[in-house]
């Protein structure tokens, strides 16, 4: 660039500027490449568990079940607002309403199995029930003696009605006609499903037979219940 004329203040001599243009090149230091990680949003944080189970008709399955962390805390907070002074049905419906749309990352495991395997309707119901039967039994340590469905998957343990409530949601998602059967006499909860089978372990409702299914422990088939709770007169449909 051209410099303007300068006056030498110590002499009377006029110093003319250089007419040659000078190019000044400024070299910037190379910047280090920094890879910034995008923070994980609350929508992307999960509790996850690899699961393995054997169906009651033979094949083994596996899958990654997960629930969003924010859904887990929502599940717990809703359940904590319930009390033992409510009816069982009131509490069950409350956790169902709060959690039923928060289980998509669990039901996706069953959707994959349904897509990949040519199972009958009876067999596919067993895939879901045997998955639940395989989750360890545990007594519940809260006021209403129930884990909400999302809470159940995260903790991966639960008691009888925790399991029947979870199955009620999931089986209905896949189009099964199910009810929850409770017995105050036996202090137990089992599933009732409207699928043809043999035997007399069923409750008749609205012209349909809902066959009992023991879902608390592994190995029980549709229509089977333990001998110590076999009297169907002591069972009632608590949720349909």
Model-inferred region functions:
Residues 1-240:
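A structural boundary/capping signal
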């Amino acid at each position: 660039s051209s410099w303007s004329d300068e006056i030498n203040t110590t002499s009377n001599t006029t110093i003319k500027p250089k007419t040659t243009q000078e190019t000044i090149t400024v070299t910037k230091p190379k910047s280090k490449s920094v890879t910034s990680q995008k923070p994980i949003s609350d929508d992307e944080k999960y509790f996850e568990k690899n699961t393995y189970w054997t169906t009651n008709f033979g094949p083994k399955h596996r899958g990654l079940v997960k629930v969003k962390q924010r859904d887990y805390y929502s599940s717990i907070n809703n359940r904590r607002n319930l009390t033992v002074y409510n009816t069982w049905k009131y509490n069950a419906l409350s956790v169902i309403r709060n959690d039923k749309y928060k289980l998509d990352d669990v039901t996706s495991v069953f959707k994959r199995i349904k897509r990949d395997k040519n199972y009958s309707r009876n067999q596919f119901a067993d895939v879901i029930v045997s998955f639940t039967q395989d989750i360890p039994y545990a007594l519940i340590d809260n006021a209403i003696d129930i884990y909400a469905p999302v809470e159940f998957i995260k903790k991966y343990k639960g008691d009888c009605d925790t399991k029947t409530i979870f199955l009620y949601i999931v089986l209905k998602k896949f189009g099964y006609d199910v009810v929850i059967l409770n017995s105050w006499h036996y202090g137990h909860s089992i599933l009732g499903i409207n699928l043809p089978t043999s035997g007399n372990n069923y409750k008749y409702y609205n012209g349909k037979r809902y066959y009992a299914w023991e879902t608390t422990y592994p190995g029980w088939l549709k229509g089977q219940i333990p001998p110590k709770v076999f009297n169907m007169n002591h069972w009632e449909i608590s949720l349909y």
